[in-house]
Amino acid sequence: MPGFTCCVPGCYNNSHRDKALHFYTFPKDAELRRLWLKNVSRAGVSGCFSTFQPTTGHRLCSVHFQGGRKTYTVRVPTIFPLRGVNERKVARRPAGAAAARRRQQQQQQQQQQQQQQQQQQPSPSASTAQTTQLQPNLVSASAAVLLTLQAAVDSSQAPGTVPPVPTTPTGEDVKPIDLTVQVEFAAAEGAAAAAAASELEAATAGLEAAECPMGPQLVVVGEEGFPDTGSDHSYSLSSGTTEEELLRKLNEQRDILALMEVKMKEMKGSIRHLRLTEAKLREELREKDRLLAMAVIRKKHGM
């Protein structure tokens, strides 16, 4: 590599590559030269040479001076931040220790992941307790529904009598509930929810059969049909359209199409006429330009 390379052992700064650094020759003063040589060679330090004798071709970079540059106050290099030259290398750990450490870290990570998965999964005891708590509530709700339906049937059979207030087997008053409310049961409730739903459907079917002598009817709640908008325009056809009306509508459509064809032909004729006019105007402009150019040429030549 061209340029000067620092002569300090282990330092490879080059004057051609490291433009920001300064490179100095060894001083001619005997005392300064001795101090420089002592600090640079560092006799007795492992990895350094004690028989170094600098020449005019040796250079020392500014990295080894306090402040990054040699001045009148800083004349001796004292900074040698080079590992392996000014300090002993730390003994390398054997490969077996590094492998054991990596295995230990992997085991710790696996244990942490297993603990997190166990925390995320719900315990079976908790789910069982929740199911046992929900079952009495479902039974009481189904009993209240049956009592309400029985009261409604009694009131429909005896219109003049006042319906009694339904009570639960424990003696508590139960208010009538709205059967149109939709109750969503969780999947964990299992067979208890299915039994309650089947009882509710059977009771509802019995009530509808008792109230309606014509038989059970299907009632859809929450869905509305599309309103009958009627014949809003001339293209709509009602269910009672006769053959004469249909023919009349078809004739109207044919008349409209014929009129549109006539208009399109007129527009095409207008476009053709405009194109011819444009071509004539362009030809006139070219003729005028030619005459003007000839007049200019004649004027230049004095003709």
Swiss-Prot record:
Residues 85-132, 155-174 are annotated as: Disordered. One of its GO terms (molecular function) is RNA polymerase II cis-regulatory region sequence-specific DNA binding. One of its GO terms (biological process) is regulation of transcription by RNA polymerase II. SMART domains: DM3 (SM00692), THAP (SM00980). A motif (HCFC1-binding motif (HBM)) lies at residues 232-235. Its main location: nucleus. Residues 93-132 have a biased composition (Low complexity). It is found in: Nucleus; Cytoplasm. Keywords: Activator, Coiled coil, Cytoplasm, DNA-binding, Metal-binding, Nucleus, Repressor, Transcription, Transcription regulation, Zinc, Zinc-finger. A zinc finger (THAP-type) spans 6-64. It holds the Pfam family THAP. The keyword Metal-binding applies. PROSITE patterns: ZF_THAP. GO terms for cellular component: cytosol; nucleoplasm. Residues 244-294 form a coiled coil. InterPro entries: THAP_Znf. It comes from the Eukaryota. Transcription factor, which has both transcriptional activation and repression activities. Also modulates chromatin accessibility. In complex with HCFC1 and ZNF143, regulates the expression of several genes, including AP2S1, ESCO2, OPHN1, RBL1, UBXN8 and ZNF32. May regulate the expression of genes that encode both cytoplasmic and mitochondrial ribosomal proteins. Required for normal mitochondrial development and function. Regulates mitochondrial gene expression, including that of components of the electron transport chain. Forms homodimers. Interacts via HBM with HCFC1. Forms a complex with HCFC1 and ZNF143. Belongs to the THAP11 family. This is THAP domain-containing protein 11. It comes from Bos taurus. The lineage of its organism: Eukaryota, Metazoa, Chordata, Craniata, Vertebrata.
